[in-house]
Amino acid sequence: MKTKVILSQQMASAIIAAGQEEAQKNNWSVSIAVADDGGHLLALSRMDDCAPIAAYISQEKARTAALGRRETKGYEEMVNNGRTAFVTAPLLTSLEGGVPVVVDGQIIGAVGVSGLTGAQDAQVAKAAAAVLAK
């Protein structure tokens, strides 16, 4: 029988805190969303001075990374390389900044970050997701 780690509220809070720490270290203001492996929102934080729309975008990035079991950067690259049909895919945000959360080799959810450039969003998301690997 397989066992599965479940992304708890405590874990989601730790992910948010790690993402905020990375953002603050760089004087950035972002929105950070954490979703379970089904793409359902568990936690959301929009830092001071972050645009309100970033809260929505971060949730969509987290959901896409959770359901797709991959970084959202891959979808953005597909679109940029000519696979434009991906922009019409339901429940898919093809913007960099969504990263799966992996524990013991299993994807247990995802974190999405918005408010900066795609690369900066991804930097914060990766730092946030890495907190559970420690």
UniProtKB/Swiss-Prot annotation:
InterPro entries assigned: GlcG_carb_metab_protein, PduO/GlcC-like, PduO/GlcC-like_sf
Gene3D superfamilies for this protein: Haem-degrading domain
Reported consequences of knocking out the gene: No effect on glycolate utilization.
Top-rank lineage group of the source organism: Bacteria
Induction section of the entry: Part of the glcDEFGB operon, which is induced by growth on glycolate, under the positive control of GlcC. Also induced by growth on acetate. Expression of the glc operon is strongly dependent on the integration host factor (IHF) and is repressed by the global respiratory regulator ArcA-P.
Any single Pfam family the record assigns to this protein: HbpS-like
TM regions (residue ranges): none
Family that this chain belongs to: Belongs to the GlcG family.
UniProt protein name: Protein GlcG
Gene it is expressed from: glcG
